[in-house]
C-alpha cells in the first residue's frame, strides 16, 4: 500500500498501519454496516489522518449525496482503493484519475476524449486539464 511504501521507501516515521484503518478488535468485512472501512464509516476512518481531504469531500457533490443517504454516492475507497493508492505526483496518476472519473461518468469521459485535452491525455501527456481541474470544489 502507499502507507507501507511511505514507511519503507520514503523513510517516514509515522504512517498508517493495518489497525489504523481496520481496527484491532471486532474487525468486519468492508460490506458489514459497522466496518470501519465500509461505506458508512470510511470517510471518518480516512479522515483520522486526512482531515483536510475528508472536509473537502464532505462539501463535494459526492459527500453531499452520501450525507443524503444515496447508495450510489462514492466514498473514499470507490476511487482510492486503500491497497492501490498512488501518489498524486506520480507519473501515471494524472492519467489514472481521468479513468477513475470515467468509471462512473462514462458519458462525460466519452465527450472528454473528443476534446483537445482528451486527445492529448490519450497520448500519455500528463500536463493537461483533467476532470478535477474544472469540476472541483477548489475552483
Regions found by a protein language model. Give the residues of each.
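Short sequence/structural segments immediately N-terminal
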Residues: 1-139
